[in-house]
């Protein structure tokens, strides 16, 4: 997400002076056009525009600006024009009414590593190629039929998470909840793709490097790079993000190639009398079938980029959301007790949470929605206008970076009562979902570029949170009190807690007859 590159932007004075003299002759203002007027916005500094006004948490800075300049405003980010949307009405107009011209995306320089921006389903513009990739990932991983087929896999990985947490309970130790949840989500993906675990909570394990590389790549994609705002400087890679991304992707592609080679060797050694068992076919098998068709639309290179997309996009959202949910519940212990009571009453004393139980847990569902309202994993939704368009009466020129501030919409007092308070009860009284139809709550986006993995993400979020609340009581470590929990954020591709939530699991009480 391009705006994530703003965080930490701090350039030496000599470099600013060099840029100033290099671009001064071509610097432009933004306020008017022969075909319309841009939205209002904060004053622009020479050359750099509004970059330094956004700070380390641009979602917060943009939300503050919107209180002065309105629900649609414009900024100058170096050489780029950006339009920021901060209301459900403007978001609906951009993502639904004008979806046909707002479905492209800007991307940062790190994503140019290995030409990922030319192969990624996340970043390539809408086209026949993009539709083919979306159809492929839906058909072989994210369709309702496939999600049902790997239900037992999800259950098994959640049970392994509960077993891991129980080991910490027996030792009386605190567990890093985000990391534990990340491992669960990661291994659901790796088993659906390769039929193996590729993540572990143990940092000494050989598989730790792979999942740590994915995490590192996600972080790199949120590091600022001057080349995104001054394209003439792109080749310098001043922050070194492209070089670091190349190293990460190279490692991941090497692992992917090992799996591909091993699978192909197994296929070649199989005789005609030894057909593939249906139960042993994973997504890699299905994708390899596509690469071996006559006039195949999917090459081996495409396959590796698609696998990269699935790992990067399919794991971080769940762990971040789960960590924020548990954090908010620790800060409102009566709500944690209420959720545990609901879950334990439905499941009973010695059962296991099943996916089929989730519809019977409305308060749990409300907690997930409220967490996504206050702490959307992706606080800013990026788009790019492919032609001139009018939104809320203002001009959005062709090739403008359009950003929907989901974080600001979720905390808008004109939309939500007591918007800064964690109140899951609000969703027991209103019919609002997170699937892109209700624009006051769009953590997964909306329109044709909405996250295709939303169903899988929601299934995993609910199962992980329900299982942790059902199986254990919880306390904070080292005498930390709820009111002193660090709520600071780290802005990037996803919105993480700056300080991980570590908590001590406690044996749950025996359910009384009053349940």
UniProtKB/Swiss-Prot annotation:
Its localization reads:
Membrane
Give me the segments passing through the membrane. Answer: 5-25
- Enzyme's top EC category: oxidoreductase
Q: Name the positions where heme binds.
A: 451
InterPro entries under this entry?
A: Cyt_P450 (IPR001128), Cyt_P450_CS (IPR017972), Cyt_P450_E_grp-I (IPR002401), Cyt_P450_sf (IPR036396)
- What's its membrane topology? Single-pass membrane protein
| E.C. code | 1.14.-.-
- List, separated by semicolons, the cofactors it needs: heme
Annotated Gene Ontology MF terms?
heme binding; iron ion binding; monooxygenase activity; oxidoreductase activity, acting on paired donors, with incorporation or reduction of molecular oxygen
One GO CC term on file: membrane
Which SUPFAM superfamilies has this protein been placed in? Cytochrome P450
Tell me the superkingdom of the source.
Answer: Eukaryota
The protein's UniProt keywords, in alphabetical order, are: Heme, Iron, Membrane, Metal-binding, Monooxygenase, Oxidoreductase, Transmembrane, Transmembrane helix
Q: Does the keyword Heme apply?
A: yes
Please state the protein's primary subcellular location: membrane
Family recorded in the similarity comment? Belongs to the cytochrome P450 family.
Name the UniProt record assigns to this protein = Cytochrome P450 76C3
Q: Which organism was this protein described from?
A: Arabidopsis thaliana (Mouse-ear cress)
Report which gene this protein is encoded by.
CYP76C3
